[in-house]
Curated annotation (Swiss-Prot):
Gene: rps9
Subcellular location: Plastid, Chloroplast
InterPro entries associated with the record: Ribosomal_Su5_D2-typ_SF, Ribosomal_uS9, Ribosomal_uS9_bac/plastid, Ribosomal_uS9_CS, Ribsml_uS5_D2-typ_fold_subgr
Record's protein name: Small ribosomal subunit protein uS9c
Biological process, per Gene Ontology: translation
PANTHER family: RIBOSOMAL PROTEIN S9, SMALL RIBOSOMAL SUBUNIT PROTEIN US9M
NCBIfam families found in the cross-reference section: PRK00132.1
Originating organism: Euglena gracilis
Keywords of the record: Chloroplast, Plastid, Ribonucleoprotein, Ribosomal protein
A GO CC term attached to the entry: chloroplast
Molecular function terms, GO-annotated: RNA binding; structural constituent of ribosome
Pfam families tied to this protein: Ribosomal_S9
The organism's place on the tree of life at top rank: Eukaryota
UniProt record similarity statement: Belongs to the universal ribosomal protein uS9 family.
Length: 134
């Protein structure tokens, strides 16, 4: 039995993306994020749209349909979370050599960087109050 859709979760900073990837026989690449077209949801920002579509471009896949549900964080973090989820879901459908391409280019690795917590006695995570000598 061959799968035609898969559901995967991706995370980045405080963003969580749950995507459903469909690989139909025909049709163009369509990405819906929270019910809107990706271009509109990402506020017409081509850079973040390119981040979301980069796994498909790397593997030269033109027939796909993605439904993404994202919450938390900003647009950049959400785009990276969607990219990770798409890459994870593609790794189920593709051959080992293509999976290796994704791994080498860092698409299957979660970026664990997040905001550092604020410490007491400081204004921010590392910003100290101004030192007064006298």
């Amino acid at each position: 039995m061959k799968l035609n859709s898969i559901e995967v979760i991706g995370k980045r900073k405080s963003s969580i993306a749950k995507i459903i990837l469909f690989l139909p026989k025909d049709g163009g690449g369509e990405i819906l994020i929270n019910g809107e077209k990706a271009f509109n949801y990402l506020q017409n920002n081509l850079r973040t749209l390119k981040v979301v579509c980069s796994p498909f471009e790397l593997l030269n896949i033109n027939n796909y349909k993605v439904h993404a549900y994202v919450k938390g964080g900003g647009l950049s973090g959400q785009a990276d979370a969607i990219k990770l989820a798409i890459s994870k879901s593609l790794s189920v459908f593709i051959e080992k050599e293509d999976k290796k391409k994704l791994k080498v280019n860092g698409f299957l690795t979660r970026n664990s960087l997040c905001k550092e917590r604020r410490k007491y006695g400081l204004k921010k995570a590392r910003k100290a109050p101004q030192f007064s000598k006298r």
